[in-house]
């Protein structure tokens, strides 16, 4: 199916139908996977001048996150300041980077999005927000959708959704309601 065929009247990509046969037959040899993963830490790490480059790249992929029950606008502001300068200036100079690395985003609860957007103004660092009943995803769909709307209206550029894990454990893939959660909400 082409992208043109999946677009709706609102210009939204409608997604593709769920084909569980793509993964229903997949099997994992758990003991082999565990053995293989245990060897990952013994493998040769990135060395010398490549190490710094990969560490900088890791910083650029990280979302600095605060999802504490006692978050405050001040705590979020401090996190945003760290996001603007994730590496000490002397290290940036010593590495010859020529610029301060930028984190991928700052991620906060929906009620803290405005504080983060304000603190990051002019920095080009996007604000992400968890939504849809973090951390368990056990709230009704209308409430999860409203949480997304609230975060986007407050300035969130990215929404990290939480799925209802029971649907996965029970292999109820259509119960995940992912198409309902796609932005823009319908």
Where are these regions (language model features)?
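Short His-Asn-centered micro-motif
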Residues: 106-110
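Alpha/beta enzyme core
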Residues: 49-57, 70-101, 111-186
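Alpha/beta catalytic barrel-like cores
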Residues: 1-95, 104-105
């Amino acid at each position: 199916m082409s992208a043109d065929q999946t677009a709706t009247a609102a210009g939204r990509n409608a997604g593709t139908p769920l084909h569980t046969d793509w993964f229903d037959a997949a099997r994992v040899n758990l003991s082999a996977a565990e053995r293989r993963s245990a060897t990952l830490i013994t493998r040769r790490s990135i060395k010398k001048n490549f190490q710094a480059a990969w560490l900088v790249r890791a910083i650029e992929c990280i979302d600095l996150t605060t999802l504490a029950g006692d978050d405050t606008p001040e705590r979020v502001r401090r996190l945003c300041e760290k996001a603007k300068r994730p590496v000490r200036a002397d290290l940036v100079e010593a590495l010859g980077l020529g610029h301060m690395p930028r984190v991928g985003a700052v991620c906060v609860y929906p009620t803290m999005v405005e504080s983060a957007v304000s603190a990051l103004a002019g920095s080009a660092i996007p604000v992400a927000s968890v939504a849809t009943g973090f951390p368990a995803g056990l709230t009704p769909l209308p409430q999860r959708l409203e949480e997304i709307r609230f975060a986007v209206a407050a300035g969130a550029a990215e929404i990290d959704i939480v799925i209802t894990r029971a649907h996965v454990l029970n292999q109820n893939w259509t119960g995940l309601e992912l198409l309902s959660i796609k932005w823009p909400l319908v």
